[in-house]
Curated annotation (Swiss-Prot):
One of its GO terms (molecular function) is tubulin binding. GO terms for biological process: microtubule depolymerization; neuron projection development; regulation of microtubule polymerization or depolymerization. InterPro entries: Stathmin_CS, Stathmin_fam, Stathmin_sf. Residues 90-188 form a coiled coil. The lineage of its organism: Eukaryota, Metazoa, Chordata, Craniata, Vertebrata. This is Stathmin-4. The keyword Coiled coil applies.
Length: 189
């Protein structure tokens, strides 16, 4: 990157000093950055894990590419060394784990049996309720049918009695007409 490009970039980004201060190795010993019109201090911001490359410069602005280098593990202790080594479980620990697993299995089995018993009881209650409702329906249907049959019987008997009464009245009327006719015939003779 050229000095002119870096200088123009510093004018565009006033927060670059804050950005650079995050990567400084020893920020307390560095003096604060003072911007001067024609000079840029390239040593002020030392960034070891980053590289800035100018890609394009035109009248509308500039473009840069920031390449982050992979972190180095120099001076970092090994990860595996800090972990305590697993010891082999003793026979007693294995036995305790097996007993705990057996207890869990028995508990789960008991819970399952309890759940199934509750479900079976609920099904039994539902069936009993359905049987009671069916019996009540049958009883009500029989009562309604008996009432209907009784009503039909009473209506039929009343209808027959009315017909019989009308027939008797007709017979009576016919008898009266016959008697009147006979009386007229006897009177005319």
């Amino acid at each position: 990157m050229t000095l002119a490009a870096y200088k123009e970039k510093m004018k565009e980004l006033p927060l670059v000093s804050l950005f650079c201060s995050c990567f400084l190795a020893d920020p307390l010993n560095k003096s604060s950055y003072k911007y001067e019109a024609d000079t840029v201090d390239l040593n002020w911001c030392v960034i070891s894990d980053m590289e800035v490359i100018e890609l394009n410069k035109c009248t509308s602005g500039q473009s840069f590419e920031v390449i982050l280098k992979p972190p180095s593990f120099d001076g970092v202790p090994e990860f595996n060394a800090s972990l305590p080594r697993r010891r082999d479980p003793s026979l007693e620990e294995i036995q305790k784990k097996l007993e705990a697993a057996e207890e869990r299995r028995k508990y789960q089995e008991a819970e399952l049996l309890k759940h199934l018993a509750e479900k079976r009881e609920h099904e039994r209650e539902v069936i009993q309720k359905a049987i009671e409702e069916n019996n009540n329906f049958i009883k009500m249907a029989k009562e309604k049918l008996a009432q209907k049959m009784e009503s039909n019987k009473e209506n039929r008997e009343a209808h027959l009695a009315a017909m019989l009464e009308r027939l008797q009245e007709k017979d009576k009327h016919a008898e009266e007409v016959r008697k009147n006719k006979e009386l007229k015939e006897e009177a005319s003779r």
